[in-house]
Amino acid sequence: MARAIDQADGLGHYCEQVLRQLLLLDPQTRYIIFLRSDAVGAAWREFANAQTCVIHSHSKLAWDQLLVPAAARRLGVDLLFNPKFSLPLLSRIPGVFVIQSCDWYVNPKNYPWWDNIYIRLMLPLYCRKARSLLCISKSTLEALAARIKITAPVTGITYAGVGPEFTEHGDPAAQRRCREEYSLPERFILTVARVLHTGHRKLPDYPGGNNERLLRAYRLYRQRTTQPLPLVVAGRDVERYLRARGFSADQLQGVHFLGFVPNERLAAAYQMADCFVLATLLESFGLPILEAMATGCPAIVPATGAGPEVAGSAARLIDPYDEGDIAAALLEVTGSPQLRARMAHAGILRARNFSWRQAGERILAVFDELVPGASATTTAAPATGS
């Protein structure tokens, strides 16, 4: 059921990296990867213990609840695993899934009404159906548990990790190419912004990125210093999003929009930035926080959601609802080389606590608890649904 694995977002990246770790750590188990198309099938043919099964369907619900469980039963699957949050409700095959977010409950206005109805109806059923639950962060689990009854045992937190390109040891040639390709200034503040709903191409813009408030805070910062640094924004369609909400060229003075930036270039941008700022209202995990810390980029992150859980004491925490606090943090961090050096060092050390391998090991431990010997002989089916 890995139909979100080709999404160009954090969820797709999480699914891909977790699956790679399972295949590498557990070579004796046969993994069947259910896909809705063969667009990414070739990526898994290098693994001798992986088999892809493409099931075409225009209906996500039919794919999750009817087609995949029928195929899993036919193929003799012993355990279903979903890196997202759905499971076949009528299947007798035991299932495990990862809770990726509780944003629908915390910020329902960020989603269309039908999405909220689906989540509020189905997610409690999935939580009852699962033999075991994993979660992307403790804060996400606590927020969800305060809103719905979770009856399945929660057996672990499967934090995300970062790829080897996100390191403090930057390649000068790669940095030079990145600077030239995107016309980056000598010094700058970096942010990674999201304005699109993940996995839903036809939905309106996603407002939970808090981009308007961050841009207003940046204007305050510019007004309070004689030498403001440019704000470099990585992310699809951000300039269009802000223009559509009334931001003029004058209001966007000093802002450089890069559009989508691949990981290799993004890592170089982190390494060159004076600091990184993320002002999202709710991070279920906050992969950009970890990426920034791993590259030695001083991080300014929200004090809400998983921000404090991921960053610990290595980052400057902000109230994402307070433009004045965001502006003050930008002034504080950009104005002190000594503070930036301390934050960079602390962030590098903090980032070492997270890895994709650890996530894979935690998931395999759950497999073994549910199906003894699962990590030696059992067929599992990594799954993703929405």
Describe the predicted segments one by one:
Residues 1-386:
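Carbohydrate transferase catalytic cores enriched for Leloir-type hexosyltransferases
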